[in-house]
């Protein structure tokens, strides 16, 4: 699926199509700030790690934590679990995570309990903060993410001093998508902390793997005509000069490890809030290190 064109390699190809459906529900859109806790799960520890995370999420929800998050597992790439939280501002993130843990003893106790177990299941963690770039996004997440089951995540590294070329290429791509009315959507987040400067995350929600299969048809002649020969030439130039690397992986949403917002859970309650039996767990998770979010 990879193509030399910057647009296709970095945006189009990496975001497979999602056809709008009548069941799509109104959604307030992507958060302005996201926090991602990335955990690399040890080989053979996936089941016990999930049990620990499930108990953590349920206990936080029962304690009325002000923080929310979506948990997801990698299906490609490294064996990772991601926990993505959304906020209006950095101050909002501080209030709902650090301040909440420091001022509500029950939340602190829960966090301490479950975070202490992570060392047995996880080999490394990383906390990443990124801000939403509406100017680079196509349709954003105008459809409630709670209706989806997978997330295509493309991580783009841009050469220092070449951010303007990345922006130009992405806008060329978006314009072509708009002209061709391509039935997909993506949200671009610029990393501000936790990864090298010039890192961008492109999120594309998928309802099923059939969305990936549909990519060639979705980006067929109508789309190629919208890009045009001049556009393809320019994109190839931008790809060569602007990008260090682009990597795409697919994550599966894991409702058991999630503490979703009411808005997300309401999109599909049977999926996001199934009846849980009490999970016997050993442990704890990384409190302030583990967020909660959208």
Q: Where do the language-model regions lie?
A:
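Small/flexible residues
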Residues: 4-5, 37
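Bacterial N-terminal signal peptides
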Residues: 7-16
């Amino acid at each position: 699926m990879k193509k030399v064109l910057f647009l296709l390699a970095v945006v189009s190809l990496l975001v497979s199509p999602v056809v709008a459906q009548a069941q799509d529900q109104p959604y307030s859109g992507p958060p302005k700030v996201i926090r991602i806790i990335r955990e690399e799960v040890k080989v053979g520890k996936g089941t016990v790690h999930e049990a620990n995370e499930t108990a953590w999420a349920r206990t936080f929800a029962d304690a009325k934590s002000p923080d929310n998050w979506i948990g997801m597992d990698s299906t490609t790439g490294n064996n990772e679990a991601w926990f993505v939280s959304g906020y209006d501002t950095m101050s909002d993130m501080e209030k709902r995570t650090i301040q909440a843990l420091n001022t509500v003893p029950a939340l602190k106790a829960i966090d301490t309990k479950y975070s202490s177990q992570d060392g047995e299941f996880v080999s490394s963690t990383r906390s990443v903060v990124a801000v939403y770039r509406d100017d680079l996004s196509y349709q954003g997440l105008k459809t409630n993410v709670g209706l989806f089951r997978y997330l295509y995540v493309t991580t783009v590294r841009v050469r220092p001093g070449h951010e303007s070329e990345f922006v130009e290429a992405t806008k060329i791509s978006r314009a072509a998508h708009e002209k061709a009315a391509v039935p997909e959507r993506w949200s671009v987040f610029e990393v501000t902390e936790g990864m090298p400067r010039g890192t961008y995350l492109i999120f594309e929600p998928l309802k099923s793997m059939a969305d990936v299969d549909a990519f060639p048809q979705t980006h067929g002649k109508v789309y190629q005509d919208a890009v045009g020969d001049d556009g393809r030439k320019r994109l190839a130039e931008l790809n060569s000069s602007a990008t260090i690397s682009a990597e795409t992986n697919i994550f599966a949403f894991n409702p058991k490890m999630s503490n979703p917002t009411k808005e997300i859970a309401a999109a599909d309650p049977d999926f996001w809030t199934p009846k849980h039996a009490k999970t016997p767990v050993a442990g704890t998770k990384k409190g302030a290190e583990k967020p909660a979010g959208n």
